[in-house]
């Protein structure tokens, strides 16, 4: 093993404890978490077993972080906890969502998509879909003011990265004539579904493709008697709400707070927890600093994209 490989191995280590895949990351502060926790069907009901196994390790990780899941919104365990937030649509019937939860302006956006010729349907994961996703990925190097990390990925990579959890996945395609112009992938997790990815061509943004995809997702969830459709977080750290939060609100997503537990396993972990060093920069930096920094990044990346298109 080279020195560089050894350094990488200390930054991330994966193994199983019982039925849960655990990943440990970090060098100065080693944090253990359940890998892909939001997408797993099982939730932690006996954290003491995982904690004792982690403490037996040499060296032991400094902190263990795990979360509860919908619909369990009240803390169950006697550990230090914070609240993470989700963007979720409570679902009863499609008609109830359409008439009572959705704002009139957003209903008009779904109608606008229909008038523009956009149709939506559940589709299979196959080579045709992979090629369509690749075309959407490669349209632009910048999305929502940040560098788009899927840009210029090759077909095998696109196929591999979108083939996760296929036994519990549903793909919805948005079509203009016969062309795929947008897609949504959601994963069924217990009694709710979680949006893993939703994306459409920027050149068709005047056709409300994303609104149409979400409407179809609600319809599918309602037909399966699911209780929630979850779309990532409602807000992120001290950045607060942004344009994406507003989009989610207009589509009837609400903020739901879920307990997240932060368990120190070492003296270093206890000190780090006291100093809140387990948090991300957007949780630590004040909003008055985060917002202008993000705005500067958006302007720079937009300028970069403009120069790239002109070249």
Predicted regions and their residues:
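Conserved acyl-CoA
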Residues: 48-59, 212-228
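Conserved glycine-rich acetyl-CoA-binding loop
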Residues: 40-44, 201-211
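A conserved beta-strand-loop-helix scaffold within acyl/acetyltransferase catalytic domains
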Residues: 1-32, 68-82, 92-206, 215, ...
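Residues at the N-termini of beta-strands
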Residues: 61-63, 192, 228
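Short beta-strand segments
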Residues: 63-68, 197, 230-233
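STAS-typified acidic loop motif
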Residues: 25-45
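Non-catalytic accessory segments adjacent to catalytic cores
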Residues: 47-85
